[in-house]
Amino acid sequence: MTQQTPLFAQHQASGARMVDFHGWMMPLHYGSQMDEHHAVRRDAGMFDVSHMTIVDLHGARTREFLRYLLANDVAKLTQPGKALYSAMLNASAGVIDDLIVYFISEDFFRLVVNSATREKDLAWIVEHAAAYGVQLTERDDLSLIAVQGPNAQQKAQSVFDDAQRDAVSAMKPFFGVQAGELFIATTGYTGEPGYEIALPNELAAEFWQQLLAAGVRPAGLGARDTLRLEAGMNLYGQEMDEKVSPLAANMSWTIGWEPSDRQFIGREMLEIQRTKGTERLVGLIMTEKGVLRNALPVRFSDADGNMLEGVITSGSFSPTLGCSIALARVPAGIGEQAVVQIRNRAMPVTVTKPVFVRAGKPVTN
């Protein structure tokens, strides 16, 4: 049986096309995915992301536990509210999930994990938390609204109260603060500035309506996917999964290698992969007609003339660039050109860094 978020009626009232997304009825779009995409790049849009799983961890040894559980190192989190992005690995260094962790206080950290991986994530965390005496609380009493775009923070602040505006006035990216009933974080999944706001379920509908009145446009899963793809942000199950190393998913920057004596789950295999080398994640741009799609093969010749093959992990038309883009996992040794087989045609593509748009502007690779 599919679940509904507390904002289901608001989506229907705005004419959303609803789809089943990992057991949740979620808006795909509200009439025009393209217009919603441009609204976020140029002004402000909002997404219902209440299907995401918020988990609060409590206990005196919570930091110690997370230093073992996560590949990134929460020792970096010294200022209350600071957040970081991390992979949670299995013993084979495959990615169980990617998540954001917030440091609230020394005995209180908050995780936000993916909805599709909820059950296995919770089971994995509970299994390893027991030895540290860490208590886990799933916050299904909270909704989550992401307000994103160059004008998103200004428009969101117009519906905050004075204390909430003061709380976020000088907040840097990747921080979160509890301000009254709202937990406001400067995080997102679009490559634009904005907030992700957790609030009690019973307040979500009214807050959504206030944002709507402030000129924030609702946006669905379709625009969320093209926005994150342009920004070069991974989607679990496509760029990485339990069989893919973070080193092959452009996530090396999220691994806390130092101090070298910190033992975290997956480290031993990760060190081997680091030495031997792995596949890598690259960007692809195709200016000819056609659309790069998931699972299409990517072929290229290496410096020795050997023909090698990788695969597109995410592909779509880019509304901002006006052409097709993709992320692809390929063997090391790829140059600046490759071909993608689309039906019976070998289409030339340019190989780039795995990011296409930053702050609303095309990235020059």
UniProtKB/Swiss-Prot annotation:
Domain of life: Bacteria
Keywords noted in UniProt: Aminotransferase, Transferase
Keyword Transferase found: yes
GO terms (BP aspect): glycine decarboxylation via glycine cleavage system
Record GO terms (molecular function): aminomethyltransferase activity; transaminase activity
Enzyme Commission number(s) of this protein: 2.1.2.10
Top enzyme class: transferase
The keyword Transferase is annotated on this UniProt entry: yes
Chain segments annotated as coiled-coil in the UniProt record: none
Catalytic activity field: N(6)-[(R)-S(8)-aminomethyldihydrolipoyl]-L-lysyl-[protein] + (6S)-5,6,7,8-tetrahydrofolate = N(6)-[(R)-dihydrolipoyl]-L-lysyl-[protein] + (6R)-5,10-methylene-5,6,7,8-tetrahydrofolate + NH4(+)
GO cellular component terms, A-Z: cytosol; glycine cleavage complex
InterPro entries attached to this UniProt entry: GCS_T, GCS_T_bac, GCST_C, GCV_T_N, GcvT/YgfZ/DmdA, GcvT/YgfZ_C, TrmE/GcvT_dom1
Stored Pfam families: GCV_T, GCV_T_C
Subunit structure: The glycine cleavage system is composed of four proteins: P, T, L and H.
Family label: Belongs to the GcvT family.
HAMAP family per the UniProt record, alphabetical: GcvT
Protein role: The glycine cleavage system catalyzes the degradation of glycine.
Protein name: Aminomethyltransferase
Species this chain originates from: Erwinia tasmaniensis (strain DSM 17950 / CFBP 7177 / CIP 109463 / NCPPB 4357 / Et1/99)
Gene designation: gcvT
